[in-house]
Swiss-Prot record:
Residues 1-17 form the signal peptide. The gene is IL17RB. PROSITE patterns: SEFIR. One of its GO terms (biological process) is regulation of cell growth. One of its GO terms (molecular function) is interleukin-17 receptor activity. Residues 18-292 are extracellular. This is Interleukin-17 receptor B. Residues 331-477 form the SEFIR domain. Interacts with DAZAP2. Interacts with TRAF3IP2. Gene3D superfamilies: 3.40.50.11530, Interleukin-17 receptor A/B, fibronectin-III-like domain 1, Interleukin-17 receptor A/B, fibronectin-III-like domain 2. Glycans are attached at N67, N103, N156, N183, N197, N283.
């Protein structure tokens, strides 16, 4: 009896058709079916999706892969379907291209699954790199004949950076500090100093702590011995302004990422006050023992009050007599425009740091506002920033590009990365607008080496120029007094009969 039941079960299983699965393998060249003539071909895919997945955090740099899933269209042409080919093109610092062919193990007998739902398959295998744009295309096989447009489907996928919850486990991200938590604490000790504490990492021994409150008000380099375990580091940073509520930015310098490592931030709060216990007085337990203490306390309080009133009166008197010299002007907004051949890392960054630290300037750079430029357009962005800025500085330099390329390579900020040069556009825009003497005080030329003004920009020869660091004091003095000059109605007469657009 049992033998009969087993035979019936086997017969039933053989009667039910097996569902197709996929077997995928690399196929770099054209598919063999492309060389054949086909009267009928399967239709295109219904849907194509891509997402990154992690197979194992500890397997290495290629543990993060691309999960490509697709849905077949439910029509009669599915009976002709043999395989689906998927090709992925990646564009970043270098371009990659690879294809896989996924063969279906069984011929399709139905347009949908017997259990219900559309036919859905997936393939996991393409490695995912950081910050890369991928173009994924897929088509069914047999494909269209030669010189015919075949059905296909494509999607775009941009992989995130090291801050992503999946990508942070890549080796490159781990070496850049993606898993490091410095646990930053910062407190205001007094009006002149801020204490910053953080947890170090064995990845490096050099850090920079920077404090910002709309502008940079203090920074300090931190060097710690290279240790195999995390330790707690502390540094006291002098500040030049109100630091309560300011932002602390901790920049590590690791061998693998240099100055482009993952940065961490914290907030400055008031340091907790350490309470001193007041000793108990035995006289309080004696009748009348508190009276001398009360009289003494009243006498001390009266003396402190009188001294405080005198000091406040004296302070107000001194403040009134020296108000013009002690009042700090708000930061000067400076728009910096520079040609694309100037090295951003070695020239623009250093010049920006000089403006912020020595000239109390709030710097506007197109490099920092690429998103706004894309939204507004370069002309509208330049016009808006020119209106908001107190000074427009055109930075010139005859630095040799090869020097910058040799030290910067293809890193961010190198001349080769500048996709759009706003220098000629800014020159033409401001030149056509600034033919009136009223606006000439707003424009200035700064250079680091002796320069020859190009014929295209010969209007610069009549504009005020400053040679850094030779004229650093005079340059800062002009920036720091720009608001006083404007309020008093003083206009710079350094430019005559020319367009002072730089």
């Amino acid at each position: 009896m049992s033998l009969v039941l087993l035979s019936l079960a086997a017969l039933c299983r053989s009667a039910v058709p097996r569902e197709p699965t996929v077997q995928c393998g690399s196929e770099t060249g054209p598919s063999p079916e492309w060389m054949l003539q086909h009267d009928l071909i399967p239709g295109d895919l219904r849907d194509l999706r891509v997402e990154p997945v992690t197979t194992s955090v500890a397997t290495g740099d290629y543990s993060i892969l691309m999960n490509v899933s697709w849905v077949l269209r439910a029509d009669a042409s599915i009976r002709l379907l043999k395989a689906t080919k998927i090709c992925v093109t990646g564009k970043s610092n270098f371009q990659s291209y690879s294809c896989v062919r996924c063969n279906y193990t069984e011929a399709f007998q139905t347009q949908t699954r017997p259990s219900g739902g559309k036919w859905t398959f997936s393939y996991i295998g393409f490695p995912v790199e950081l910050n890369t744009v991928y173009f994924i295309g897929a088509h069914n096989i047999p494909n269209a004949n030669m010189n015919e447009d075949g059905p296909s489907m494509s999607v775009n996928f941009t992989s995130p950076g090291c801050l992503d919850h999946i990508m942070k486990y890549k080796k490159k991200c781990v070496k850049a500090g993606s898993l490091w938590d410095p646990n930053i604490t910062a407190c205001k000790k007094n009006e002149e100093t801020v204490e910053v504490n953080f947890t170090t990492t064995p990845l490096g021994n050099r850090y920079m702590a920077l404090i910002q409150h709309s502008t940079i008000i203090g920074f300090s380099q931190v060097f710690e011995p290279h240790q195999k375990k995390q330790t707690r580091a502390s540094v006291v940073i002098p500040v030049t302004g109100d630091s309560e509520g300011a932002t602390v930015q901790l920049t590590p310098y690791f061998p693998t990422c240099g100055s482009d490592c993952i940065r961490h931030k914290g907030t400055v709060v008031l340091c907790p006050q350490t309470g001193v216990p007041f000793p108990l007085d035995n006289n309080k337990s004696k009748p009348g023992g508190w009276l001398p203490l009360l009289l003494l306390s009243l006498l001390v309080a009266t003396w402190v009050l009188v001294a405080g009133i005198y000091l406040m009166w004296r302070h107000e008197r001194i403040k009134k007599t020296s108000f013009s010299t002690t009042t700090l002007l708000p930061p000067i907004k400076v728009l910096v425009v520079y040609p694309s051949e100037i090295c951003f890392h070695h020239t623009i960054c250093y010049f920006t740091e000089f403006l912020q630290n020595h000239c109390r300037s709030e710097v506007i750079l197109e490099k920092w506002q690429k998103k706004k430029i894309a939204e507004m357009g370069p002309v509208q962005w330049l016009a808006t920033q020119k209106k908001a800025a107190d000074k427009v500085v055109f930075l010139l330099s005859n630095d040799v590009n090869s020097v910058c390329d040799g030290t910067c390579g293809k890193s961010e900020g190198s001349p080769s990365e500048n996709s759009q040069d706003l220098f000629p556009l800014a020159f033409n825009l401001f030149c056509s607008d600034l033919r009136s003497q009223i606006h000439l005080h707003k424009y200035v030329v700064v250079y680091f080496r002796e320069i020859d003004t190009k014929d295209d920009y010969n209007a610069l020869s009549v504009c005020p120029k400053y040679h850094l660091m030779k004229d650093a004091t005079a340059f800062c003095a002009e920036l720091l007094h720009v608001k006083q000059q404007v309020s008093a109605g003083k206009r710079s007469q350094a430019c005559h009969d020319g367009c002072c657009s730089l």
